[in-house]
């Protein structure tokens, strides 16, 4: 009996219950019972589990649709991360649970952070709607020939119902040498009539009931993988229209033809290699080794400026590259590199020459670049790693002064209160000092945290903090999630350093009202201090 109960816990491709020695199958689980879904603890960022409860779903949907269509800056994306992935009650006004969860799932998929997806599934094991995430996760790792990584997810999630994922789980059980469990799940699905002929045939071959056959399917990555594993002497020639997941699988399974064996007289094969390189399936270095195998006469190499125009685009690239390797003059090198780059771009292959181009430019001293190639050089060279600048305190300017230590959690509230009033005393004596908006932002943030400003310093500046009524209403109603979306929308594609100080003031004022001090402090320390 204990053994049966253990099996019921393990085999969850379908919901299985055992009563009176009869197996019952429930294949219709609803998302409507889900009340909570998320990844981060609300308290981590000073939020509440009710952060979405009072918001109108129409506002949420329109704002999220706008945000997900943009290429957000790092900080804007961080706010969206916190808003969407914090564990919270699901809103229920003018938005269904499925709609809201789909925004979370689509966002995680767009980020392509598979560790984050795994963590989300671990913390939300009963989300049947999470099958979209599970499929994305399993397909990614299988297309990269990492079957064990694909299979591990089935030990985490409690509920799957789709035929595809159930088939995937059965195959994983076979792969893990848990054939009895695979057979039980197979028998259950057979009773339901949910198994297709292709999978049944491959299952029987893998279980040893039938001999291997030559049946191949490109329907999905699982079926293509099963084809590979059950066909003797498996060979597959990809075509231009071959799906990318198959290209990835072939590359990571060492099933692609080595570039040195590609027939350079075969135009389609060359173009396939170029497309695969652009899609990061082939290495750029392999493509350029292929270009080296082309044969050109001395006149073509000497008169490349005219000769390459008479060739097919891929042949022209081979000629330009070979001529580049014979060139030592920097202006001529840059001319050849720019012609190569232009040729790749015109053939819609912008990613096939980015790493190689950056590497070649790295070997050219920047001070020897002619002025007419400066833009080309700066745009395509390898980005320099910027050294992280340190904050330098300057007590002559309030927003650059030692009070910034408080926002780095280096000083206590009583200490910063004393330091603030001491600095304001000096500023009051200095008749030439004019309070800037940056100074005001710091003082208002300190006041928001409870710093008491002495009455004699309270009129050093005029400041009216009038937030729009729409935002004010959201704050009063506890619609923190929606307010965070609005902040992310305001920042959009801009880096914090590029925001106007009025925008910084507006955002910091909202965060002060919400008491979201960590996010506020990050903005202040990015925008205000003097850095060296």
Could you tell me what each predicted segment is?
Residues 106-107, 136-141, 172-173, 509-510:
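Residue-level signature for tetratricopeptide repeat
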Residues 94-101, 126-135, 147-148, 160-168, ...:
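Generic helix N-cap/helix-start motif at coil->alpha-helix transitions
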Residues 2-94:
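Long, acidic/serine-threonine-rich intrinsically disordered regions with weak helical/coil propensity
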Residues 111, 144-145, 176-177, 514:
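Structural motif corresponding to the intra-repeat A-B loop/turn of tetratricopeptide repeats
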Residues 230-421, 425:
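Extended alpha-helical solenoid scaffold regions that build the rod-like backbones
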Residues 158-163, 174-197, 203-231, 441, ...:
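TPR/TPR-like (Sel1-like) alpha-helical repeat modules
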Residues 46-55, 68-69, 84-93, 119-129, ...:
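Solenoid-like repeat scaffolds
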Residues 114-117, 147-151, 181-185, 370, ...:
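Solenoid-repeat scaffolds in large eukaryotic assemblies
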């Amino acid at each position: 009996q204990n053994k049966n109960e253990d099996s019921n816990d393990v085999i969850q491709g379908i919901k299985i219950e055992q009563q009176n020695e009869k197996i019952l199958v429930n294949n219709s689980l609803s998302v409507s019972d889900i009340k909570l879904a998320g990844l981060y603890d609300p308290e981590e960022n000073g939020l509440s589990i009710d952060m979405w409860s009072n918001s109108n779903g129409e506002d949420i949907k329109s704002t999220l649709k706008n945000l997900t269509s943009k290429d957000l800056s790092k900080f804007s994306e961080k706010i969206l991360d916190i808003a969407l992935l914090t564990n919270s009650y699901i809103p229920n006004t003018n938005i269904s649970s499925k709609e809201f969860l789909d925004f979370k799932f689509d966002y995680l998929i767009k980020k392509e952070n598979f560790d984050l997806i795994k963590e989300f599934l671990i913390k939300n094991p009963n989300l049947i709607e999470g099958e979209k995430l599970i499929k994305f996760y399993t397909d990614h790792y299988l297309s990269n020939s990492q079957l064990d990584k694909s299979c591990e997810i089935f030990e985490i999630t409690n509920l799957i119902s789709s035929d595809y994922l159930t088939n995937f789980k059965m195959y994983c059980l076979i792969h893990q040498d848990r054939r009895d469990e695979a057979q039980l799940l197979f028998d259950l699905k057979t009773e339901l009539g949910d198994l297709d002929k292709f999978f049944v045939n491959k299952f029987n071959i893998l279980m040893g009931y039938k001999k291997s056959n030559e049946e191949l399917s490109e329907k999905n990555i699982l079926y293509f993988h099963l084809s590979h594993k059950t066909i003797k002497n498996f060979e597959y020639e990809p075509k231009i229209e071959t799906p990318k997941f198959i290209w990835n699988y072939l590359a990571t399974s060492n099933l692609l033809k080595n570039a040195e064996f590609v027939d350079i007289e075969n135009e389609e094969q060359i173009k396939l290699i170029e497309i695969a390189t652009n899609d990061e399936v082939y290495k750029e270095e392999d493509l350029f080794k292929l270009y080296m195998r082309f044969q050109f006469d001395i006149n073509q190499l000497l008169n490349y400026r005219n000769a390459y125009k008479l060739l097919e685009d891929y042949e022209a690239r081979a000629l330009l590259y070979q001529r580049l390797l014979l060139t030592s003059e920097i202006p001529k090198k840059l001319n050849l590199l720019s012609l190569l780059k232009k040729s790749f771009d015109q053939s819609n292959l912008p990613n096939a020459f980015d790493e190689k181009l950056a590497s070649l430019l790295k070997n050219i001293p920047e001070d020897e670049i002619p002025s007419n190639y400066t833009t080309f050089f700066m745009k395509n060279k390898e980005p320099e790693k910027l050294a992280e600048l340190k904050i330098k305190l300057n007590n002559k300017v309030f927003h650059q002064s030692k009070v910034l230590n408080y926002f780095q959690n280096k000083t206590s509230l009583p200490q910063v209160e004393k330091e603030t009033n001491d600095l304001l005393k000096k500023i009051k004596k200095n008749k030439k000092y004019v309070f800037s908006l940056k100074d005001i932002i710091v003082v208002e943030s300190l006041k928001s945290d409870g710093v008491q400003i002495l009455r004699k310093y309270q009129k050093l500046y005029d400041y009216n903090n009038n937030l729009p009524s729409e935002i004010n209403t959201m704050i009063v109603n506890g619609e923190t999630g929606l307010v965070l979306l609005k902040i992310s929308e305001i920042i959009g594609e801009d880096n914090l350093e590029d925001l106007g100080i009025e925008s910084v003031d507006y955002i910091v004022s909202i965060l002060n009202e919400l008491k979201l001090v960590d996010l506020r402090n990050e903005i202040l320390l990015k925008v205000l201090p003097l850095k060296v």
